[in-house]
Structures are given as structure tokens and as C-alpha cells.
Regions:
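Bacterial N-terminal signal peptides
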Residues: 2-12
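N-terminal (or domain-start) structured segment
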Residues: 18-104, 142-144, 166-191, 195, ...
């Protein structure tokens, strides 16, 4: 009888915990309206609203340190989440920030990955990554590439390529990925590391030539296109990743619950199809896998940032 009472009490406590969250709206703080990060955050919010039975609101803030700063200072109760791209954990390597993304935030899940494709203007003779490396080595500083903001994946992806290949390719900065692609189309620059969504139509029309994709394995986003890694630079990866975080002291049971519900939302086929058309792959792994990927990316790109002396201040 005592055993029955004890088991019943434990079961009751579990049920109470399950009913405790959420009892009010949940907020996802993210960057400015527009772009892939905002899109994924909104799709997750829709899925969570349906599964949790509470409204999940997307709170857009200016891109930069503000979204992270808000969530770091929020109560660790699961009601304030942060959805951010790779720039969040790259920021401390590029500038001084008022918080530590690794120590002050707890990862929930890596939600999505938008890989970069190495594309060249057709005037460039290279048709493969090996050709491109050979061309760059033969003419140091003669080739250039266009990229978006300093520290963006299009910038760091190119610098990683230079670092691993041991070549000198000059950066031509643009205000964003769109202008960089226009510059590539117009012949202002010779190459770029761009998302499939931003260059797919131009590749199909023959206005740009794709050499390889920055994924670890061949991707359905670019059928038939080899990876940079298998084309001469083993271990190379370049993508803009995005995931969900909570304040660091958030209880493990809430992180587990949020992970389960977010991954469930991400695995819906209509959501996957929508993001696929945007050049984005759904990931949705565990919080431990996300933490490991952040650590690996920071270590990998940290060497590049230090060697190139890249700063955003």
C-alpha cells in the first residue's frame, strides 16, 4: 500500500510539472523582420502555439547583440526564448559583447542550416574547386570575392576557404548578400559564397556557375553539385546555422520539453518544404548536439578570424 501511494505521488508530481508550463504566452526574441532567421522563428512559433496550447509570440528586435542581451537577462523559466543565427556565437570572436553566449545561454536545438554555394562569374575559367585553387595560387591577389556584412557566413565561408586552401583572394564588401550577388552578376566581383536561394535561378540560367556546396555531404538543395570538402578541401563546411536558446539556469526538464516540441514542429513536411524552397535544411537535433556544433564552429572559425585579423568594431 505504501509503495502504491509513493508511486502515485511521483506520478502526480510529474503531471503537475507537465501542467505547470506553459500557463501564459511564451516569447521568442529574434532579429529584425525579414530573412531566414525570422521566417524559421515564426514557423516554430506557429507549431509551438498549436502543441503547447498557449500563444507563442515572435518579438523582433534590431539585429545584433540586443536579442541575446534581452534573453540573458530574462528569468530562466522557459517563457523567454532566443532564436538566433550563427552570428550570436561568432560575435565574441569578432567584437566585445556584454554577455557570453556559451556561458549565459543554454542551447535547446539547432533548428536549421542554410549552406553556402561557391559560385563564380562565367568569365572565370575555373569549373571545379581544384581549378579555382590552382588559379588563385597562380595569381595571388588577382581574384576577388563579394560578401555581405563582416562576420556573415558569406564572409567567414570565404575566409575559411582561403585559410584552408592557402590562397590570397581579395574581399569586396557589400551591404548584404543581395547586393553581393548583383555585383557578381555584373562582373564587379569574380566569385561569392552565397545561399542556394539567392543564386539558384542565376545558376539555372547560366549567368553564374556553381562549383561546390559547403555542406558536409551532398545536398538536395543543389542536386549533382559536389561538396567543397570532397572537391579538394576535406573538412570544409560553410553555412548560416540558426537555433533556439534559453537563459542558462533554465531547468533541464523545460529544455527537454521545449526541445521535443520544437523538433516536432520542425519535422512537419509542409514546414520542411517551405524552408527547402528558401534554401534551408531542417536539422532539429538534441541540445547536446547543438552545444557540440557551436563549440566546433567557434574553434574552427576562431582560427580563421584570428589569422585574418577580422574585427567588426
Amino acid at each position: 500500500m505504501r509503495f502504491f501511494v509513493l508511486v502515485s505521488a511521483v506520478a502526480f508530481c510529474g503531471a503537475v510539472h507537465a501542467q505547470e508550463f506553459p500557463t501564459r504566452p511564451v516569447r521568442i526574441v529574434t532579429s529584425a523582420v525579414g530573412g531566414t532567421t525570422d521566417l524559421v522563428a515564426r514557423l516554430i512559433a506557429q507549431g509551438l502555439t498549436a502543441s503547447l496550447g498557449q500563444q507563442v509570440i515572435v518579438d523582433n528586435r534590431p539585429t545584433g547583440i540586443i536579442p541575446g542581451e534581452i534573453v540573458v537577462k530574462a528569468p530562466p523559466d522557459g517563457y523567454t526564448l532566443l532564436f538566433s543565427g550563427s552570428s550570436l556565437w561568432m560575435m565574441p570572436l569578432l567584437q566585445k559583447v556584454p554577455f557570453d553566449p556559451v556561458k549565459d545561454l543554454a542551447p535547446v536545438t539547432l533548428a536549421s542550416s542554410t549552406p553556402n554555394i561557391v559560385v563564380v562569374n562565367p568569365a572565370v575559367s575555373a569549373t571545379t574547386i581544384k581549378d579555382l585553387i590552382a588559379l588563385a595560387r597562380a595569381k595571388p591577389g588577382a581574384l576577388n570575392y563579394g560578401s555581405g556584412a563582416t562576420g556573415a557566413s558569406s564572409h567567414l565561408g570565404a575566409e575559411l576557404f582561403k585559410y584552408m586552401a592557402g590562397v590570397n583572394i581579395v574581399r569586396i564588401p557589400y551591404k548584404g548578400q543581395g547586393p553581393a550577388v548583383l555585383g557578381l552578376l555584373g562582373g564587379e566581383v569574380q566569385m561569392s559564397f552565397a545561399t542556394s536561394a539567392s543564386v539558384a535561378a542565376h545558376i539555372k540560367s547560366g549567368k553564374l556557375r556553381a562549383l561546390a556546396i559547403g555542406t558536409a555531404k551532398p545536398s538536395a538543395l543543389a542536386p549533382g553539385l559536389p561538396t567543397v570538402a570532397e572537391s579538394g578541401l576535406p573538412g570544409y563546411q560553410s553555412a548560416s546555422n540558426a537555433g533556439m536558446f534559453v537563459p542558462v539556469r533554465t531547468p533541464a526538464r523545460l529544455i527537454t520539453l521545449l526541445n521535443r516540441e520544437i523538433v516536432q514542429a520542425l519535422n512537419k513536411q509542409d514546414l520542411k518544404d517551405l524552408l527547402f524552397r528558401d534554401g534551408t535544411e531542417v536539422i532539429g537535433g538534441s541540445s547536446q548536439e547543438f552545444a557540440a556544433s557551436i563549440k566546433a564552429e567557434m574553434a574552427n572559425l576562431g582560427k580563421v578570424i584570428k589569422a585574418a585579423g577580422i574585427r567588426t568594431e
